[in-house]
Amino acid sequence: MTAPHKVAFPARCAVNICYDKHLCSQVFPAGIPVEGFFEGMVELFDADLKRKGFDGVALPAGSYELHKINGVRLDINKSLDELGVQDGDTLVLVPRVAGESFEPQYESLSTGLAAMGKWLGRDGGDRMFAPVTSLTAAHTAMAIIAMAVGVVLALTLRTRTITDSPVPAAMAGGIGVLLVIGALVVWWGWRERRDLFSGFGWLAVVLLAVAAACAPPGALGAAHALIGLVVVVLGAITIGVATRKRWQTAVVTAVVTVCGILAAVAAVRMFRPVSMQVLAICVLVGLLVLIRMTPTVALWVARVRPPHFGSITGRDLFARRAGMPVDTVAPVSEADADDEDNELTDITARGTAIAASARLVNAVQVGMCVGVSLVLPAAVWGVLTPRQPWAWLALLVAGLTVGLFITQGRGFAAKYQAVALVCGASAAVCAGVLKYALDTPKGVQTGLLWPAIFVAAFAALGLAVALVVPATRFRPIIRLTVEWLEVLAMIALLPAAAALGGLFAWLRH
């Protein structure tokens, strides 16, 4: 005989609502803020009065508030339980007036601390002073393992630069295999502990990548770096597929983006001795292309389906069937619509799947924007060549790229993408100022004063933009002007980058 199921009901509170000369009893939830049902309560009260033949609530919407019977205003952002309202209490619906809401006063410090502690610990734990739990111990252990892995990595790379022996690679690979075994044990035994699996997995990927890079003979170079970066990309993709968490997907995408760019640079350096400036120019152009392709790549990764075309009569106009390309639909005839078993049954994803795809698209976009923003300062550093014949052209290329990064941020609705691009552009500006300051002759004026003034002016400009742009509604002509300036900057950037990289000279000769 099975035990009966227990059903939990939300806490309720029966109160009397008084308005003018009318009194009505209503039952409200006691555990949610009053704001959630306040407007509905007024509408029900108004309908009840009109049903009984009275005039109803004469106050306009949004111009009333609740008071206790003694005239104390109630804060509708809090629940009835937090406000101390009990069953049988009378609340008065009155016009809104100026003033502050009621706040409970405590006669002693101990009473106030006790009440605050009770509120902080209402979810089952004291959030003011978090105790040491098993989760804390596990995360501390992972931090200790990460410290040990860092020491092993440093010693492995140091030893590999000195000797061509396979011992460093074997040592790093052996410890990496142990971490892989630990990740598999967590995956099989405690599948819900994604944090431990991620910790073991990322540390194992780093160790195995270093081991793979150190294994081939010869002095460490571009070929060794390419091998290690490929291992990191494969390991990151494996972790992302296994965990399927939103933040983990963003981290994996950022790692794959950065390592993919570095792998492309290493592959070029394997076959041709390309200068750092030329590589940096190519990276800058590639970063702009990646930013423009971010939505397309995210949609491709998430496998977003085309929209479903229906009619207001409820009959499908177009539908997709199994075996058709994802970007095509077929018209649905009346005979097909009446047949329940026809092969034109629409297979478009429903609401839950669309929401999951949207989260995946957002995570991929965040990762790509973060990865590109991490590479941008290094690329700007490589492009700039102070006190060289074409230094002004390099400065122009870097400045146009930074400006395009900032303007591209307005194309992303989510905050993390835009913030990542703007922060990456700002870091690139600081990197450029730092390179010019370090390259100038040692002196107070050129090495400190002018760079500090420039950085301070740039920060002040950023603060002014942050205060003005979000609160201002710009006219269409201004937005159109910004778009045209962005197009002109792109048109000027490509020839300047080609001239700086020597493409025109190479074509001429």
UniProtKB/Swiss-Prot annotation:
GO-annotated cellular components: plasma membrane
Main location: membrane
Superkingdom of this protein's organism: Bacteria
Keywords: Cell membrane, Membrane, Transmembrane, Transmembrane helix
UniProt membrane topology term: Multi-pass membrane protein
GO BP: symbiont-mediated evasion of host immune response
Subcellular location: Cell membrane
TM annotation in the entry: 135-155, 170-190, 196-216, 222-242, 248-268, 281-301, 364-384, 389-409, 418-438, 449-469, 487-507
Coiled-coil ranges per UniProt: none
InterPro entries for this protein: EccD_transm, T7SS_EccD, YukD-like
Extra remark: Was identified as a high-confidence drug target.
Subunit structure: Part of the ESX-2 / type VII secretion system (T7SS), which is composed of cytosolic and membrane components.
NCBIfam families: T7SS_EccD (TIGR03920)
Family per record: Belongs to the EccD/Snm4 family.
Name of this protein: ESX-2 secretion system protein eccD2
